[in-house]
Amino acid sequence: MKPLENTIPALNTAAICERLKQVRIQVCGTRGQSHFAALLHLSPSTYNYYEKGRIPPVDVLDRAARVTGVPLLWLIRGEPTDFSLESLKKIDVPAGSDAGMVSANGTAGV
């Protein structure tokens, strides 16, 4: 029997970060990075690290999946391959809100 580590394919960090970015652009638009970070309960700078190549923890990926409706396995592995970003609902990003906190239901925080 082969050791377990030889049977599990390595994660592609760059691909995970790129899929997370694609989801953010699809649901919040190109200027919605801070808004999307707030939806994930992250600071904009922490979220930016994830888009720039630092692998997000599983709880962040899970939150992104729950908030957007993206399959978690798609974020991690790109499966199922028939998943389409176009099926995601857009989240309205209030004008000038790219620095404010927003709750998961899309309402502005206080």
List PLM regions with ranges:
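A short, Lys/Arg-rich alpha-helix, primarily the initiator
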Residues: 1-29
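DNA-binding alpha-helical recognition surfaces that contact promoter or target DNA
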Residues: 18, 22, 38, 49, ...
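The alpha-helix within a helix-turn-helix
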Residues: 24, 37, 65
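Short alpha-helical DNA-recognition segment
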Residues: 27-49
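DNA major-groove recognition helix of helix-turn-helix
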Residues: 51, 68, 76-79
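DNA major-groove recognition helix of helix-turn-helix/homeodomain DNA-binding modules
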Residues: 59-74
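Interfacial/linker helices and their anchor residues that mediate assembly or domain coupling
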Residues: 83-110
